[in-house]
Amino acid sequence: MRGLFPPIALASTSPRRQALLAQIGVEFKRLDIKVDESPQPAERPTSYVYRLALAKARAGWGQQPPRGRLPVLGADTAVVVENEILGKPADRAQAGVMLTRLSGRSHQVLTAVALTNGDEAQYRLSVSTVTFKRLTKDECEAYLASGEGLDKAGAYAIQGWAALFISRLEGSYSGVMGLPLYETGELLGNLQERKK
């Protein structure tokens, strides 16, 4: 469906986000954006993902030369257990602790998407509930040894081997991957309408 949406800049180096945008035919330029992803004191998970998605989009806007700037899409994903944000694990030990917390229970995955064209910004939020089966020690060890979840929020990748752990998903598969396509399509569609 190329041509349905205007070209944009993606404030992310995530291969998953790039593949998801390509899946819906969006032409994009990739921007390597670094923002501090530390939660603020007493920050709610929804506020956290909104803040980071917007920070990434704004940083991407500022990174482009003024002439020929493209609208910038930023996204952020958080895995939430009992209102606690599980970010990307610092190391294998922390990833193991996260998997243990997720084992045999449900958690939420929040992904916020922000699109900015300068001073103006739009947002969308995807909220999904993911249920893990009870993991055995061998399953945890094998998954940790794979290294697959070490750079992912909550220490797992739904599109990889961790799919074997998920007994139920309510919400957006692409949102759990890191870029909810329905919400992204809404933002890009609104941008396209304003260009007419």
From Swiss-Prot:
Protein name: dTTP/UTP pyrophosphatase
Organism: Nitrosococcus oceani (strain ATCC 19707 / BCRC 17464 / JCM 30415 / NCIMB 11848 / C-107)
Subcellular location: Cytoplasm
Keyword RNA-binding: no
Keywords: Cytoplasm, Hydrolase, Nucleotide metabolism
Reaction catalysis annotation: dTTP + H2O = dTMP + diphosphate + H(+); UTP + H2O = UMP + diphosphate + H(+)
GO biological process, one term: nucleotide metabolic process
Site (Important for substrate specificity): 16, 77, 159
Top-rank lineage group of the source organism: Bacteria
Cellular compartments per GO CC: cytoplasm
Enzyme class: hydrolase
HAMAP family: Maf (MF_00528)
E.C. number: 3.6.1.9
Active site: 76 (proton acceptor)
Molecular function GO labels: dTTP diphosphatase activity; UTP diphosphatase activity
Required co-factors: a divalent metal cation
Gene3D superfamilies in the record: 3.90.950.10
Family membership: Belongs to the Maf family. YhdE subfamily.
Protein function: Nucleoside triphosphate pyrophosphatase that hydrolyzes dTTP and UTP. May have a dual role in cell division arrest and in preventing the incorporation of modified nucleotides into cellular nucleic acids.
Lineage: Bacteria, Pseudomonadati, Pseudomonadota, Gammaproteobacteria, Chromatiales
Keyword Cytoplasm: yes
